């Protein structure tokens, strides 16, 4: 679907960079979720970095996920920044 996630990358401080199929890009902060249920496991930074995409949703190996609708509603858009600057953030974890 048009709101599926097409790219995700871990960032410092429990944030992720996401790109949505419709072209939106943003930074999603997971800190508010880290004390809830199965998402507690994401506090392990090495595990957090194993983020991926399954069926258009952001996921981790033990079945934690963030729905695209939640990402879109709560992410901080980065559309006003050049794409290459965010590629550097993703590649270098700055």
How would you name each of these model-derived features?
Residues 1-94:
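Motif-centric detector for short Cys/His coordination patterns
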């Amino acid at each position: 679907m048009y709101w599926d996630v097409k790219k995700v990358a871990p960032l410092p401080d429990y944030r992720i960079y996401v790109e949505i199929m419709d072209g939106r890009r943003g930074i999603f902060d997971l800190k508010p979720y880290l004390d809830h249920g199965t998402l507690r496991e994401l506090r392990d930074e090495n595990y957090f970095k194993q983020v991926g995409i399954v069926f258009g949703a952001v996921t981790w190996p033990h079945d934690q996920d963030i729905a695209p609708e939640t990402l879109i509603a709560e992410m901080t858009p980065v559309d006003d920044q050049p794409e290459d600057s965010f590629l550097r953030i993703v590649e270098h974890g700055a």
